[in-house]
């Protein structure tokens, strides 16, 4: 009789991209157990030109990647709003959020906002207060100081629950 497989903890970085504030959250997942590792946000100087703000986001995420050394990363997909200019700028911040982990060889999964809410809360249309309340249950040691950091933790939790399918899709696209 063979022994059951040993589950190794996997460190996951969740990123909630934004031009004013990019949230990040790091958890470890082992089976169905989640452990809070860290969270915060990168807040570039809004008075800087766009390219400099994007560079600050990249530098901030690079520091997080170096400090916490995640094995996988996940980013929230962008929704399109009425302001096309704002959507394009958010897309640029999202590009940086996907590029930073990719530059160090980390696969990046993407999740729709409704799937993140459904995974964490159980319903696809939840507000930020509901997400923060559920984070206290799922990650009792987490005390995110910003809604963006809380959202990033929710993204990491979503990846922990859906990572098998997301990684298979990533490998299929890369093949």
Curated annotation (Swiss-Prot):
Enumerate the catalysed reactions: Endonucleolytic cleavage at a junction such as a reciprocal single-stranded crossover between two homologous DNA duplexes (Holliday junction)
Record-given protein name: Crossover junction endodeoxyribonuclease RuvC
Report the active site residues: 16, 76, 148
Record-annotated residues binding Mg(2+) 2? 76
The answer to whether UniProt assigns keyword Transmembrane to this entry is: no
| SUBUNIT field | Homodimer which binds Holliday junction (HJ) DNA. The HJ becomes 2-fold symmetrical on binding to RuvC with unstacked arms; it has a different conformation from HJ DNA in complex with RuvA. In the full resolvosome a probable DNA-RuvA(4)-RuvB(12)-RuvC(2) complex forms which resolves the HJ.
Instruction: State where Mg(2+) 1 binds.
Output: 16, 148
From the UniProt record, report the name of the gene that encodes this protein.
ruvC
- Record-level GO BP terms: DNA recombination; DNA repair
Which Pfam family, an example, fits this chain? RuvC
* Enzyme Commission number(s): 3.1.21.10
InterPro entries per record = RNaseH-like_sf, RNaseH_sf, X-over_junc_endoDNase_Mg_BS, X-over_junc_endoDNase_RuvC
* Nucleotidyltransferase as UniProt keyword: no
HAMAP family per UniProt: RuvC
Cofactor binding note from Swiss-Prot or TrEMBL: Binds 2 Mg(2+) ion per subunit.
- Name any cofactors this protein relies on: Mg(2+)
Its top-level enzyme class, in one word, is hydrolase
The family note in this entry says: Belongs to the RuvC family.
For this UniProt record, the keywords arranged alphabetically read as follows: Cytoplasm, DNA damage, DNA recombination, DNA repair, DNA-binding, Endonuclease, Hydrolase, Magnesium, Metal-binding, Nuclease
**What's this chain's function?**
The RuvA-RuvB-RuvC complex processes Holliday junction (HJ) DNA during genetic recombination and DNA repair. Endonuclease that resolves HJ intermediates. Cleaves cruciform DNA by making single-stranded nicks across the HJ at symmetrical positions within the homologous arms, yielding a 5'-phosphate and a 3'-hydroxyl group; requires a central core of homology in the junction. The consensus cleavage sequence is 5'-(A/T)TT(C/G)-3'. Cleavage occurs on the 3'-side of the TT dinucleotide at the point of strand exchange.
> Which compartment or compartments is the protein found in?
Cytoplasm
Q: Which GO terms describe its molecular function?
A: crossover junction DNA endonuclease activity; DNA binding; magnesium ion binding
Q: Which GO terms describe its cellular component?
A: cytoplasm; Holliday junction resolvase complex
